[in-house]
Curated annotation (Swiss-Prot):
It comes from Chlamydia muridarum (strain MoPn / Nigg). Signal peptide: none annotated. InterPro entries: MYG1_exonuclease (IPR003226). This is MYG1 protein TC_0665. It comes from the Bacteria. It holds the Pfam family MYG1_exonuc. Belongs to the MYG1 family.
Length: 289
């Protein structure tokens, strides 16, 4: 007899793919956390409503998500299989599916299937999950598995929150892009950069963006492309580089000057008015106005 809202996965050492697969099923309220059964016993697995990363079968209809069998020739791990299943159910709109896949799940699939290895000095999500395994081999790993599971659930929850927030910001960015040319002016800090380029920003004439941050204002140069995000279309004057407070006030002649990054892509001002004054000064020096 099948146990409703249960999921089976293998015991022993765990990896990011089955941890992520279980986290997704829990997040979308398809299984209960206390009905995760970690085993390789085929009879026990047969009682589970869902089975991930064990069992030698991939079947959406039967809710079986293993990728180790020779008959499976796709590129997913159990994480990618479950994400696709949620998309197939209609629980994940296509845009959110693509977002979760590109930000996290695809990387899990690649690393689990041996197509990606982290370079020295870099630590991926999959590397972090692996670290939660017991240091000594052969022990009971349930405690550590559930610790890693909670971490994955928290991360996926935050990613979904960020996705929704970014989509709200995109509407604001679109409106500002339609009415501004040289500088995108925002009344609040928001996720502008990726949205700007996803909306055709490479061909937009804006060179700067301004917005409040706490009780100050930021004036930032816009990169030519998202891949070249540490560059800017129009840099601040070289003699502003790394200056603070009175030094920047002296260099700019603007009393509200606070800071200019040594990379000449970001500056901080004490008010909207000072920020606008700095913008006009830079544009004038560059011959834009």
């Amino acid at each position: 007899m099948q146990i409703p809202r249960s999921v089976g996965t293998h015991d022993g050492s765990f990896h990011a793919d089955e941890v992520t697969a279980c986290a997704l099923l829990i997040m979308f309220d398809l299984v209960d956390k206390d009905k995760i059964i970690r085993t390789r016993d085929s009879e026990k697995l047969a009682q589970c409503e869902y089975v991930c990363d064990v069992g030698g079968r991939y079947s959406i209809a039967d809710k079986r998500f293993d990728h180790h069998q020779v008959s499976y020739t796709g590129s997913w791990s159990s994480a990618g299989m479950v994400l696709d299943y949620l998309h197939h159910l209609g629980s994940l709109p296509h845009e959110e599916y693509e977002y979760l896949n590109s930000t996290l799940v695809h990387g899990v699939d690649e690393q689990d299937n041996g197509r990606f290895f982290s370079k020295e000095g870099f630590c991926s999500f999959s590397d972090i999950i692996k670290i939660y395994n017991p240091l000594e081999e052969g022990g009971n790993t349930d405690k550590e598995f559930f610790f890693a599971l909670h971490f994955a659930i928290d991360l996926l929850t935050r990613l979904r929150e960020k996705f929704r927030y970014d989509r709200i910001c995109r509407d604001v960015v679109k409106q500002v892009m339609e009415k501004e040319d040289v500088c995108l002016r925002f009344d609040r800090p928001l996720a502008w950069q990726e949205n700007f380029f996803s909306l055709g920003g490479e061909n937009h004439p804006a060179a700067f963006v301004s917005f409040p941050c706490s009780d100050q204002w930021i004036l930032r140069g816009i990169p030519p492309t998202l891949d070249r995000r540490m560059e800017v279309r129009i840099p601040f004057p070289e003699d502003w580089a790394g200056l603070l407070g009175d030094q920047l006030v002296k260099a700019t002649g603007i009393p509200g000057a606070i800071f200019c990054h040594k990379g000449l892509f970001l500056s901080v001002w004490d008010s909207r008015e000072s920020c606008e004054e700095a913008l006009n000064l830079v544009l004038k020096q560059q011959g834009v106005v």
